[in-house]
């Protein structure tokens, strides 16, 4: 299983104060020196709430690890990434809403302009991945447009797992739709969410598409996904950075790597 470390929220700390620290390149090399991280993931959002264009340029210039850039189909961002001298190892196209706290679901593959953006990256020799819900129609779209990799949105699975097996439902930011569900209901929905991820990962494998997954994964809910043999990569960020605030980035990375690289 490949471990993709999302370092967006290292930069969130910097941008909150509009200062120079924490240094994104220091985070990069801490990750590299653990010898446990396979790639670095960043999300270049339209609103630039964390990662900036300059961060992209600096990372691509010196990173010893592959860089996966998440982004929307925004024309300005597409043009910027297609113009880069140093190319990312892949671009993962994600849905984006300026009012969202974080990505809320998978990509709508009927989105106007999506096909043109995929073609633009392919024409520049940049691998494309699509951040999708685990649905067969989305996989068929990927195959039809020569997309060799997808990342399944694991938010539904992760939220259900957290509601059932942690104290998430008692916290200030508890998800209201899950608070009133019984443990039996949560278990059934969690089981179904896991089965759907497993089915679609297997479907992707038979289509010749590499299946990755990410969103909301943490030190508790990630373990079950290791039972899906056709999943090849997990992208995890917020949970690792949250733990890093308390124990340090190196230790937080190593603890996660110990879980997913058995």
Curated annotation (Swiss-Prot):
Q: Describe, as the record does, how this protein assembles with itself and its partners.
A: Homooctamer; tetramer of dimers.
Matching entries from PANTHER family are given as: PYRIDOXINE 5'-PHOSPHATE SYNTHASE
Lineage, uppermost ranks? Bacteria, Pseudomonadati, Campylobacterota, Epsilonproteobacteria, Campylobacterales
Q: Which GO terms describe its molecular function?
A: pyridoxine 5'-phosphate synthase activity
Q: Which GO terms describe its biological process?
A: pyridoxine biosynthetic process
Q: Per the UniProt entry, what species is this protein from, by scientific name?
A: Helicobacter pylori (strain P12)
Protein name as annotated: Pyridoxine 5'-phosphate synthase
Which compartment or compartments is the protein found in?
A: Cytoplasm
Tell me which residues bind 3-amino-2-oxopropyl phosphate. 6, 17, 216, 237-238
Coiled-coil-forming residues are none
């Amino acid at each position: 299983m490949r471990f993709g470390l999302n370092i967006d929220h290292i930069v969130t700390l910097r941008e909150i104060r509009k200062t120079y620290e924490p240094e994104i390149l220091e985070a990069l090399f801490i990750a590299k020196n653990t010898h446990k991280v396979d790639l670095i993931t960043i999300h270049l959002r339209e609103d630039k709430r964390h990662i900036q264009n300059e961060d992209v340029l600096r990372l691509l210039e010196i990173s010893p690890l592959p860089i996966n850039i998440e982004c929307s189909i925004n024309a300005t961002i597409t043009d910027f990434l297609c113009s880069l001298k140093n190319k990312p190892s892949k671009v993962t196209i994600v849905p984006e809403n300026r009012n969202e706290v974080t990505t809320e679901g998978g990509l709508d593959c009927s989105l106007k302009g999506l096909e043109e953006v995929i073609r633009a990256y392919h024409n520049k020799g940049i691998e494309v991945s699509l951040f999708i819900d685990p649905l067969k129609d989305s996989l068929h779209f990927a195959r039809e447009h020569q997309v060799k990799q997808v990342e399944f949105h694991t938010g539904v699975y992760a939220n259900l797992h957290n509601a059932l097996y942690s104290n998430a439902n008692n916290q200030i930011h508890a998800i209201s739709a899950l608070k009133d569900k019984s443990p039996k209901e949560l278990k059934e929905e969690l089981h179904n969410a896991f089965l759907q991820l497993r089915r679609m990962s297997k479907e992707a494998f038979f289509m010749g598409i590499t299946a990755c997954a990410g969103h909301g994964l943490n030190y508790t809910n990630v373990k079950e996904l290791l039972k899906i043999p056709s999943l090849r990569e997990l992208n995890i960020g917020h949970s690792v950075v949250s733990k890093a605030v308390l124990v340090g980035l190196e230790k937080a990375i190593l603890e996660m790597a110990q879980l997913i690289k058995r």
